[in-house]
């Protein structure tokens, strides 16, 4: 029997939600930390991996923290993306299910989204190892070729590099389509670039580590409303997510929830890794 990884995205999908789910499923944290530490990224950042209680369940929390006013803070800052209307989100259950001979369940995650401002009601443990980079910021932003070079220069396996490059390509093509430019001219700027690079690399490392045979996404659940970003006020789904869904045939279900549940990086992960949109009739869990 093959090992199929099933993502139940009842509360959407983002990069850090995906990494946390994969760690809870059994991806090796030591391998993830060591491999991320070899990425030649100039900007300082910290990786926080901790256990948190959500809906009375013990779950993994994965955060990329970037410096702000002398402190390392959650990267979801107002200067990147903010909701038009302030509200709290508790995203429950992006469950990653590995259907095969061996299986772990991952339930109820309440995670921040890549490059978006969400008010989270949870705290983070600081008693864990942090991965740092200690040089100056990369002010001009990075293009896809430069980011591919970062992956290539790391100790990521060939399989993980291939996954990361597929995710990056999907994201870059969507951004190029949104802005009416060539993929080679797309740049990911400032903090959002670091966050996206880490989330993409971490997802690829964990997926490769789990060694699954296929990935199932039946549907992505999305909210409604607007988000305020560097380009102004955008509708939900944001244009990059819409482009990814259209280009790759992703199925969406819209919920009566205000706010963004599917981020561009999350949609790119789904589009780049999906092998089926249908669950098998019977399976071992």
Where are these regions (language model features)?
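A glycine- and small-aliphatic-rich helix-loop capping segment at beta-alpha/alpha-beta transitions
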Residues: 23-28, 203-212, 232-240
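Extreme N-terminal starter segment of soluble prokaryotic enzymes
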Residues: 1-5
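Glycine-rich nucleotide/cofactor/substrate-binding loop typically near the N-terminus or early
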Residues: 24-174, 178, 238, 247-267, ...
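General beta-strand structural signal in soluble alpha/beta enzymes
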Residues: 7, 186-190, 216-219, 254
């Amino acid at each position: 029997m093959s090992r199929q990884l099933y993502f139940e995205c009842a509360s959407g999908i983002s990069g850090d939600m995906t990494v946390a789910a994969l760690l809870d499923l059994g991806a090796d944290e030591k391998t993830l930390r060591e491999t991320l530490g070899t990425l030649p990224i100039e900007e300082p950042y910290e990786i926080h991996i901790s256990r948190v209680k959500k809906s009375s369940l013990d779950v993994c929390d994965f955060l990329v923290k970037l410096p702000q006013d002398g402190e390392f803070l959650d990267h979801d800052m107002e200067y990147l993306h903010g909701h038009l209307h302030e509200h709290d989100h508790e995203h429950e259950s992006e469950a990653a299910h590995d259907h095969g001979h061996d299986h772990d369940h991952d339930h109820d995650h309440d995670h921040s989204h890549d490059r978006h401002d969400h008010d989270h009601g949870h705290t983070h443990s600081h008693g864990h190892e942090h991965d740092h980079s200690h040089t100056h910021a990369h002010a001009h932003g990075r293009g896809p070729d430069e980011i591919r070079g970062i992956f290539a220069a790391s100790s990521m396996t060939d399989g993980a590099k291939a996954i990361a490059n597929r995710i990056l390509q999907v994201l870059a093509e969507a951004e190029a389509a949104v802005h009416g430019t060539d993929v080679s001219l797309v740049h990911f700027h400032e903090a959002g670039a670091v966050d996206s690079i880490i989330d993409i690399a971490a997802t690829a490392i964990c997926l490769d580590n789990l060694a699954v045979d296929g990935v199932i996404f039946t549907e992505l659940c999305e909210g409604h409303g607007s988000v305020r970003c560097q380009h102004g006020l955008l509708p939900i789904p944001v244009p990059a997510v819409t482009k990814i869904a259209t280009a790759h045939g992703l199925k969406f279900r819209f919920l009566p929830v205000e706010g963004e549940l599917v981020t561009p990086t999350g949609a790119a992960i789904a589009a780049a890794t999906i092998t089926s949109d249908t669950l098998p009739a019977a399976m071992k869990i």
